[in-house]
C-alpha cells in the first residue's frame, strides 16, 4: 500500500487542546507521523487539505446500525426483542447485516467504529459488539 500525505490540514485531535495546522503521513493504512513540513516517499499520494479541517474517526457508542433491517424491511429488524424485558442471551453479532447500506453511510459521515446491539426497549437487552464500519463484499458479521 502506497503512502499518503495530507498536507496543511487544520487538525483536531484528542491530545491538543487547540486545533493546529500540520501534515499527516499515512503508511500501510496507519498514521506514521504528524507534524509540520513532513516529507513523503516519491510515490505517495498527496492531498492538499489547506483550508480544510481534519478529524479522527468518530465512534458511535450506542447504535443499532446493521440490525435495523434498512433496505430489507421489518423481517430484517434484529433489535428490541419484545417477548421479554430480560434478553441477555441476545447477541448482536448474530443479527448484523454486514451489507447494510447504513454502514457505508456512517463511514462517509466520519464514523469509523460502532458499538451496535439489541435491546434499547429491554431492561437487559443482550450483548453489543464493537466493530469497524468498513467491510469488503466477502466479509461477514464475524469479520466486523
What is each stretch, according to the model?
Residues 133-140:
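Conserved small/polar residues in nucleotide/adenosyl-binding loops
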Residues 9-11, 133:
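A short, amphipathic beta-strand motif
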Residues 2-3, 11-55:
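Histidine-rich, glycine-flanked metal-binding segment
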Residues 52-118:
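Metal-associated gating/positioning segment near the N- to mid-region
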Residues 143:
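Cationic, low-complexity basic patches in intrinsically disordered or flexible, solvent-exposed regions
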